[in-house]
Swiss-Prot record:
Any one GO BP annotation for this protein: proton motive force-driven ATP synthesis
Broadest EC class assigned to this enzyme: oxidoreductase
Temperature dependence: Optimum temperature is 90 degrees Celsius for membrane-bound enzyme but 80 degrees Celsius for the purified enzyme. Membrane-bound enzyme has a half-life of 2h at 100 degrees Celsius whereas the half-life of the purified enzyme is 30 minutes at 100 degrees Celsius.
Regulation: Inhibited by 0.1 mM Cu(2+).
pH profile of the protein: Optimum pH is 7.0. Active between pH 6.0-8.5.
Protein name per its UniProtKB record: Probable membrane-bound hydrogenase subunit mbhJ
Subunit structure: The membrane-bound hydrogenase complex is composed of MbhK and MbhL, but may also contain MbhJ.
One Pfam family here: Oxidored_q6
Lineage of producing organism: Archaea, Methanobacteriati, Methanobacteriota, Thermococci, Thermococcales
Record family assignment: Belongs to the complex I 20 kDa subunit family.
Subcellular location: Cell membrane
Provenance organism: Pyrococcus furiosus (strain ATCC 43587 / DSM 3638 / JCM 8422 / Vc1)
Keywords, alphabetical: 4Fe-4S, Cell membrane, Iron, Iron-sulfur, Membrane, Metal-binding, Oxidoreductase
Free-text comment on the cofactor: Binds 1 [4Fe-4S] cluster.
Function: Probable subunit of a hydrogen-evolving hydrogenase that utilizes protons both as a substrate for hydrogen production and proton translocation. Acts by coupling the redox reaction via ferredoxin and iron-sulfur (Fe-S) clusters to proton translocation across the membrane, thereby conserving the redox energy in a proton gradient.
Length: 167
């Protein structure tokens, strides 16, 4: 599958899920000590080539407005309490996506005395997007998985499968 066809499939699925839940997902990004590689790929997913904002997937400035938390980095000792606070400030229902090798498994920082990775030791994680850094297509796939979980939480029912129409 080419990147272009994969991207179009993901875009279509995001639009379908947003229509099903009746709103657009708002996302808050938490950098917990990353090298910024994953952060750059998140921004790439929002640029015109991928254009997740076209479907309403929008970065917000406060966790109090977010449906989805994107967390990058190995969760340094300095960022540990902030990550917990941001999680608590995000209203329910919420979804947490760990973006990159650092929050998903620790990467080169695993068992370092200065980090607390993996992220699921600290807060519940719903979707893991591995990679160092993950491609924008992988991030969009993670958003699709997050939206499917969010749809189940909001609507109390399973969203239609890819290709099926909403009623």
């Amino acid at each position: 599958m080419t990147n272009n066809s994969e991207r179009k499939r993901l875009e279509k699925r995001i639009a379908q899920l947003c229509k099903f839940i009746g709103r657009s997902p708002w996302v808050f990004h938490v950098n917990s000590g990353s090298c910024n590689g994953c952060d750059i790929e998140i921004i790439a997913a929002l640029t015109p080539r991928y254009d997740a904002e076209r479907f309403g997937v929008k970065l917000v400035g406060s966790p109090r407005h977010a449906d989805i938390l994107l967390v990058t980095g190995p969760v340094t000792n300095q960022s540990l309490e902030r990550v917990k606070l941001v999680y608590e400030q995000t209203p329910d229902p919420k979804i947490v996506i760990a973006i990159g090798a650092c929050p998903t498994g620790g990467s080169v920082f695993y068992e370092s005395p200065f980090t607390n990775a993996p992220l699921d030791r600290i807060i519940p994680v719903d979707v893991f997007v591995p990679g160092c850094p993950p491609r924008p297509e992988a991030i969009l796939h993670g958003v699709v998985l997050a939206l499917e979980k969010l749809a189940k939480m909001i609507k109390g029912e399973v969203p239609p499968e890819e290709g099926e129409e909403n009623e």
